Amino acid sequence: MRTYRYFLLLFWVGQPYPTLSTPLSKRTSGFPAKKRALELSGNSKNELNRSKRSWMWNQFFLLEEYTGSDYQYVGKLHSDQDRGDGSLKYILSGDGAGDLFIINENTGDIQATKRLDREEKPVYILRAQAINRRTGRPVEPESEFIIKIHDINDNEPIFTKEVYTATVPEMSDVGTFVVQVTATDADDPTYGNSAKVVYSILQGQPYFSVESETGIIKTALLNMDRENREQYQVVIQAKDMGGQMGGLSGTTTVNITLTDVNDNPPRFPQSTYQFKTPESSPPGTPIGRIKASDADVGENAEIEYSITDGEGLDMFDVITDQETQEGIITVKKLLDFEKKKVYTLKVEASNPYVEPRFLYLGPFKDSATVRIVVEDVDEPPVFSKLAYILQIREDAQINTTIGSVTAQDPDAARNPVKYSVDRHTDMDRIFNIDSGNGSIFTSKLLDRETLLWHNITVIATEINNPKQSSRVPLYIKVLDVNDNAPEFAEFYETFVCEKAKADQLIQTLHAVDKDDPYSGHQFSFSLAPEAASGSNFTIQDNKDNTAGILTRKNGYNRHEMSTYLLPVVISDNDYPVQSSTGTVTVRVCACDHHGNMQSCHAEALIHPTGLSTGALVAILLCIVILLVTVVLFAALRRQRKKEPLIISKEDIRDNIVSYNDEGGGEEDTQAFDIGTLRNPEAIEDNKLRRDIVPEALFLPRRTPTARDNTDVRDFINQRLKENDTDPTAPPYDSLATYAYEGTGSVADSLSSLESVTTDADQDYDYLSDWGPRFKKLADMYGGVDSDKDS
């Protein structure tokens, strides 16, 4: 529908003030236009001033979203100078002029060419002016007016999120806050109810509710259980116009998840479990697994297992597998089928975290009975002790019984057991054991001073099943017997001054004993009976395992007796008494007035001879000269014994090659020069062997010189014959070592032992006639026949 508005500008001549009048208007919207009078004054030839009415307007109103086929009429502009003759021209400028808004330049009618949207631009400011069409000059000042776009309800509410996600604990009270949703409306909130939004719930009842004005979603049902239903989808509607009929609406989806609380106790799926385990299971061995189910999740489903009652509280244990939430029953102590075959346990499963507000639901734990059957296993023998300690005197004879060990089969069969000694622990086979009763006895003599403790291992093995065996350590202590005599702790050699007084101490003696008596050592010292009478010295026993040598007279003469050998008898007080005689050497020496030794007879024991520096230098020079002389003499002798460069004629035709040299090429690449055979004059005279000199020397025989055309074969034969008849040629009477020739050779082996083929071909009886030196050899070779006979 087109809306018309006419603005009439009236001019009244002769009135002293302007008069406002209401313009004619047609407006379907019912909004009255405000009147505004703009007075423009003009000059006239008469002195009478006249006031003119110019534009009368303020603003236009225009509905948005116009859907008509024609342009939407906005209003009309009119000037009082417009006489209808087309002399004026109306011009429009400002927001949307010429595009959104056009004006009829003749009539001043304004129209909208496009559909307008208030949400895009609610106000347009334009300017209007009337000009003289002929001169182009404005006849009225330019004036500004406003076109306001009137809002209609053309926008539905839009939520800030398409999908909301929220959580709320299960078992919550009614009215528990869940989440708040928000929707906005682009319409003008200041005009009508187009932007007034009201919330309502379309889906999700009776579990949840929503506040109509705030959009807050709350729980509407008591004790919603996650285990029954965990996910909920709620659809919320936002409607404008205050929810009235004809209002626009929008919806959103809220996905609500119930979070878990610990409202379910653990429960065993069965009341009784049974497992089997062999009695040989070591501590820590898992026997079986039990599992209680808990409908909760996360930490609310964590379970702790414990043994609360039963016959095996101290024999078994239960641990919790944190990954699978299973209870693992393990062996805590060693089991014995012969003692107990069946155990009954009570295992409890409980939640470590319990919310007090759910205690009314009952105890958060459950129990089950576990029956464990112990299976019999063929066990090795068991010794009566973990270790044995025995004692024996070191003077015990061979086959002396020390003690015994005992082991038996723990199984019900009671298989017999045999005993043995682990020879890796008794390499010298000092001990042995009776395989039947386990008695330990000696097989060799013992010596405590050699080894005090003997640590061996005894093995007990089932006769019917040798694989079943066990070991036990056996510690044998050798008890001491007084079988060692005491002796001096060191070699004693002392001196006495010539001017010594009687009863003067010249040496303190100490003794040691390899034995270890229970009451400790107690030694006694005395002079040997043969030296006790007429001795120049006496022995004083200090009763503390030491003794002192005292002078018996005043003064000693080293020229009469320079050395005294003093035999001292050392005895112990153990049984049987052991004693030994040690000799103390006492030298008579010259001493100073302080008693310090200066010289003893013709030699000094401690002090140097007192040579002067010059004498020492002379001695050193003599030693150097002597060494130089020896070195020169040895060098001259070596020069004289240098080997000659010329080799013997026997070696002329020989190529000596060492074939045991690996690498470096072969040495026989330099073959014998055949030219030597053709030039015998170049051969030197025969020379004797350098390594062995014969006892009788013969003059070398000169061989005739062969002609140049002498046949090589004749020359070689001549040389061969010459060497065969030469007494100076080898072999000499010396030891020669030959390699094994083998049996394929015509000469067989050169070994005399291989010269006969069988033992029967050689008679060794003659070796017995060679005397006692060859008796061993005669026994070796003469006993062959007897061995065969046997």
Swiss-Prot record:
**Gene Ontology, cellular component aspect:** adherens junction; catenin complex; cell junction; glutamatergic synapse; nucleoplasm; plasma membrane
Q: How does it sit in the membrane?
A: Single-pass type I membrane protein
- Give the signal sequence positions: 1-18
The principal location of this protein is membrane
- Where, in residue ranges, is this chain on the Extracellular side? 54-615
Membrane-spanning intervals of the chain: 616-636
User: Which CDD domains does the entry mention?
Assistant: Cadherin_repeat
Mark out the compositionally biased spans (Polar residues).
Answer: 269-279
Please name the GO terms that the record assigns under molecular function. Answer: beta-catenin binding; cadherin binding; calcium ion binding
Q: Which Pfam families match?
A: CADH_Y-type_LIR, Cadherin
| Subcellular location(s) per record | Cell membrane
The free-text domain remark for this protein reads:
Three calcium ions are usually bound at the interface of each cadherin domain and rigidify the connections, imparting a strong curvature to the full-length ectodomain.
UniProt function note = Cadherins are calcium-dependent cell adhesion proteins. They preferentially interact with themselves in a homophilic manner in connecting cells; cadherins may thus contribute to the sorting of heterogeneous cell types.
In Swiss-Prot or TrEMBL terms, this protein is called Cadherin-6
